[in-house]
A protein has these predicted regions:
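Long, terminal "pre-/pro-" and other extracytoplasmic accessory regions
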Residues: 1-253
């Protein structure tokens, strides 16, 4: 009655959010299932470990010229990630340097590609990957790659490359910056983002509720290719920022 405080037998408890409650996590789950299905359909001898970086020369031929909307969306996404600290500002600035170089690439079949252009490819789920390429020592390499959900603009992967020692001392994002990356994906309300315990990841957040993992890393690599029949290589660094699904059992410890 009015003015009396009574104990409720079964007080309301808000349901714990799960991955199924979030569009982008449902999309990532479907993407993972598709990738697993494709791997199962390949001959066993061609299966390899996951690549540490994105190969360029094997992928450009499967892409098409990006229209201005896709190129602008990827550029804006990188700028916003740089503003929040989720992507190092210097890396984003170099990746988005749009000064025309006149560089081009001609593949083994004689097909010409302008490297002043942006390229993209879209999968059947609507994830669009936008990339820019460059040349180093006459070999093609990936300058940056951004994968977004085309319906929402949510970024799930950003990968950038920088030459040698310019990138060696890049600081990794703060926890606040990684939380901003979760927020742009609409996942802040999962409510339990935290650095995974006893994890080899130097910079990561994990949500048990969503089974979602955000990681950021930098690492040196040697880019290798061929110019004609002559091997060429270039020492570079990559920066990788990803949102992916992982159960607690799948977290490395």
């Amino acid at each position: 009655s009015l003015g009396r405080v009574e104990t409720v037998a079964d007080p309301y408890v808000a349901p714990t959010p799960t991955a199924d409650d979030y569009y982008i996590l449902r999309q990532l789950a479907a993407r993972s299932r598709n990738a697993e299905s494709e791997r199962e359909q390949r001959p066993a001898e061609v299966l390899t470990a996951p690549k540490m970086y994105i190969g360029a020369s094997a992928s450009l031929q499967s892409m098409q010229y990006a229209d201005s909307a896709a190129a602008e969306a990827a550029g804006n996404a990188l700028r916003q990630l740089a503003e929040t600290g989720a992507v190092p500002a210097a890396w984003a600035a170099e990746a988005l340097d749009t000064a025309e170089t006149g560089e081009s690439y001609t593949d083994w079949d004689g097909k010409y590609y302008s490297l002043d252009a942006t390229y993209c490819v879209t999968d059947s789920l609507g994830f669009v990957t936008v990339r820019r390429f460059g040349m180093t020592d006459n070999a093609l390499f990936t300058r940056y790659s951004v994968t977004m959900d085309s319906r929402t603009g949510t970024v799930v992967e950003a990968w950038l490359s920088m030459a040698g020692t310019d990138a060696e001392n890049t600081p990794l994002p703060t926890e606040t910056a990684l939380r901003s990356f979760a927020a742009q994906a609409g996942l802040e309300s999962l409510g339990d983002w935290a650095a995974p315990a006893d994890s080899p990841y130097g910079c990561a957040l994990y949500s048990t509720n969503g089974g979602a993992l955000i990681t950021a890393s930098t690492h040196p690599y040697t880019y290798q290719d061929y110019v004609g029949t002559a091997p060429v290589s270039s020492d570079r660094w990559y920066y990788s920022l990803t949102l992916q699904l992982r159960t607690e059992d799948q977290l490395p410890g």
